[in-house]
Amino acid sequence: MYNFKEVEKKWQDYWEKNKTFKTDGYDFSKPKFYALDMFPYPSGVGLHAGHPEGYTATDVVCRMKRMQGFNVLHPMGYDSFGLPAEQYAIQTGNHPAIFTNENIKTFGKQLRSLGFSYDWDREISTSDPKYYKWTQWIFKRLFEDGYAKYIDMPVNWCEELGTVLSNDEVIDGKSERGGFPVVRKNMKQWVIDIPKYAEKLLEGLDELDWPESTKEIQRNWIGKSTGVEVKFDIKDGGEFKIYTTCIETIYGITFMVLAPENPLVDELKTRIKNWDEVVKYREETAKKSDIDRTELNKDKNGVVLEGIYAINPVNNKEVPVYLGDFVLASYGTGAVMAVPSHDQRDFEYAVKYNIPMIQVIEGRDTKESAFEKQDYLGKECKLINSEEFTGLTVEEAKKAITKKLVDEGKGEEKTNYRLREWIFARQRYWGEPVPIIHLEDGRSIAISDEDLPLVLPTLDDYQGKNGKAPLENDPDWVNVEVDGVKGRRETSTMPGSAGSSWYFLRYIDPHNDECFADPELLKHWMPVDLYVGGPEHAVGHLLYSRMWNEYLYDKGLVPVKEPFKKLVHQGMILGSNGLKMGKRFPKYCINPSDIIRDFGADTLRLYEMFMGPLDADKPWNDDAVVGAKKFIDRVYRLYTEDNKISDKENKNLDKIYNQTVKKVTNDYESLNINTAISQMMIFINAVQKEDVFPREYAEGFIKLLNPLCPHVTEELWKVLGHNNTIAYEKWPTYDDSKIVDETYEMVVQVNSKVRGKINVSTDTSDEEMKKLAKEIDNVKTFMEGKEVVKEIVVPKKLVNIVVK
């Protein structure tokens, strides 16, 4: 009977005592492999069922890579600063520092109980002054180079949390943490000028082995566009600018829209006849988040600025000016031209307020809906009602109208980005202090490097009141003097995203007090070869960390532009009811510690990897957990009770063994771990039908299973007569000559007519078959100059390529 509790504790103690997985960072003799998990926030509830999924996947690859002769860096730490810890502390009456340190101990214990092969000597936490010394050091460089700025700007303010939130922390007008209402207000705020890196961040995406969906999310968030910035005069004095990518529609303008918070509105106050109505509308708008305001499906609303008219620069026609909450002062120029015949949002606004419409591009009627650019671009549509430009195609008109505006000094070509500044301060306690002093003479200066880290003071009262930051409660810490000039320390703290924006660099040299990491080590270990974590970080952490790394690269402080070479997202582990685990359905929540207690860590690891593809969402199944445990028990009995292991050969197992080594190796490499497990189960079934299990194959199989089930395989390695750990044994190899697959001929058709034949084996994938088919010269001839509409594979019969 396999006693998993005894065996798992035994080997965890062994690994800890012998520092089995300690990485010699300076061993450059071996090829390197740096695998990274998105480090957890150490919450009070400990690990949840989703944590082991991604962590096990990276551990599987790391254990294989060690056996393949790689020097593996596989660290772990804690994203321990930020709102979650502080909110929990307030709710429970604990101090966030005490609470966080206790949770880190709990997390560390739970992670060790899962048998992960982390180098625990590299453990970090973002709330450790030895760590955030370097977070502050990097911020200081950003400040000195003009990327960290202290500016007045509209921000997302959450009264309940008492702090500013970044756009990615606001969901449907509420805070991501706690679901509290968020409003817009103007505040003096620290920001990182990430838009300056917009083009570099876009270019870098092309070279990354990341999910295409994540790259596309970042491209859309950055939002690059090319267009024209046009100056509009205001009747009786004044002007403003708009930016448009549809300059061809400028003759169709029937009104203009300003952002409610646009400063121009205040300048026009004395000329606006319905000022009280304007004030009321602006107050209502301030209660909405940017996301709420720009939601396409929302009801369009606004207010006209009575007495204010803009003059269209191409025909000098006067058009009314409105306020509309869908226009943001922080995006573009804070003003837009409205062409209701060719923009659906403008169309709905015009219908609501009975504003005239002018169609300026032919193609279809615009009485029921707008004829938008996605409908007319590239279709040789021509302009109408556009004076001298009438009759030109859209593409011709774009160039001609732009030239006219530029020549007359009324416009200029411009590239814009949707990406906004990264708000880099929170009016909260539990975060890195910002190493800046505001002096009475108006200067803001960074403290010296010798004074880093600027340690977060211990406060009994760590709750801010009336919008004031908690650090205001410690006047002895706040009030300072520099060269005889009085000043005040910055009392906002950095956001939770600060420490996570560079932690992958610190793991490489975590105890260095002279620099954030030895340049020689950075050159060897960067970039991260495999990064596993959730897709929800696409426009937060994954964008911010790329920007910080790019900045450090430009400074010559890191050797690579991009930090994460390959990114994989694990799917969500759902409750057995098929829904997300959480407070709403407590009986469907799974605690990993319970599974480890009842079935063992190896069972949990094996089960979570066998649930399905790593990137898919998967419902929990208690019966399948039992099934995983039974498989481990079967393997244990095979090695300890069945007396089949022998130095004799068994030709019957040659093919299945070599197939298994090949498939498991390839599947681990590609993170198709569930299919690797299926193959190992097939192999064990085959072995149990035989009387002889050759020792070479028995040892090879244990090595294959080790990355998934490290405890039982260490024990069985010992049963096989070895006294050393299996962790650094040589990975099994396979003999292709013993993998004799059935081959067969398949017909290749183009538009259902035979154009060639290919020979394939039983393990040739559909994609490989399509590729082979398209490499046939005769097939190429019939495909030339045509678009592939569909590719059909009928197993063991044919490949049909449909073209037009």
What are the residue ranges of the model-derived segments?
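Conserved phosphate/anionic-ligand binding catalytic regions in large, soluble enzymes, centered on
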Residues: 240-262, 422, 428-430, 434, ...
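NTP-handling and nucleic-acid-processing catalytic cores
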Residues: 2-12, 49, 135-362, 463-478, ...
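N-terminal catalytic cores of NTP/NDP-binding nucleotidyl/phosphoryl-transfer enzymes
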Residues: 24-96, 100, 123-138, 244-245, ...
